[in-house]
Amino acid sequence: MSENEVKDPRIDGIKTKIRVVPDFPKKGIMFQDITTLLLDPKAFKDTIDLFVERYRDMNISVVAGIEARGFIFGSPIALAIGAKFVPLRKPKKLPGQIIFEEYELEYGSDRLEMHVEAVDSGDRALVVDDLIATGGTLCAAMNLLKRVGAEVIECACVIELPELKGRERLEGKPLYVLVEYR
């Protein structure tokens, strides 16, 4: 959400349902736990509805959800807007022919994989994850989709941790978030 947009009152309800767990999974991390959001049907529905309201008229043909929590939000968005859902998986989870994109983590590297035939050249893609921190995973997802000829329209996350500057790594691609934690 940009600063000049009017804040939807549902966002405050969503924010109150996200539990912050200090020192998980390691000391110094303030973990944003969305499982408490999922336990509240109204807050979960409001979350999906806000994304659907934004994307239903943008001619999105594919919603790419990043494993694992991007699946939770991406699938119902895709269904509601009439787009196909493509799971972007961690290594060795997909059978058949895959394409992959490696990306760097704070300590080491990882990769995202998708089926080769899942996305067509010219598809209009939305990338969905639960949270953006450093932006590495979203960048890998965008690169993967671009390599098969898709046009990435926007990235969408429930939560942004702005102090980690992930938005700056997205090469100017729009990012829509519901909740910022400072």
Curated annotation (Swiss-Prot):
Name of protein: Adenine phosphoribosyltransferase 4
Disruption phenotype: No visible phenotype under normal growth conditions.
Lineage: Eukaryota, Viridiplantae, Streptophyta, Embryophyta, Tracheophyta
An MF annotation (GO) of this entry: adenine phosphoribosyltransferase activity
Protein task: Catalyzes a salvage reaction resulting in the formation of AMP, that is energically less costly than de novo synthesis. May contribute to the recycling of adenine into adenylate nucleotides and the inactivation of cytokinins by phosphoribosylation. Possesses low activity toward adenine, but can efficiently convert cytokinins from free bases (active form) to the corresponding nucleotides (inactive form).
Cross-referenced HAMAP family: Aden_phosphoribosyltr (MF_00004)
Annotated keywords: Cytoplasm, Glycosyltransferase, Purine salvage, Transferase
Gene3D superfamilies named in the record: 3.40.50.2020
GO cellular component terms, semicolon-separated: cytoplasm
Enzymatic reactions: AMP + diphosphate = 5-phospho-alpha-D-ribose 1-diphosphate + adenine
Keyword Glycosyltransferase belongs to the record: yes
Enzyme class: transferase
E.C. numbers: 2.4.2.7
Associated pathway: Purine metabolism; AMP biosynthesis via salvage pathway; AMP from adenine: step 1/1
Chief site of localization: cytoplasm
A GO BP annotation: purine ribonucleoside salvage
Quaternary context: Homodimer.
Family, as annotated: Belongs to the purine/pyrimidine phosphoribosyltransferase family.
InterPro entries named in the record: Ade_phspho_trans, Adenine_PRTase, PRibTrfase_dom, PRTase-like
Subcellular localization, as worded in the UniProt entry: Cytoplasm
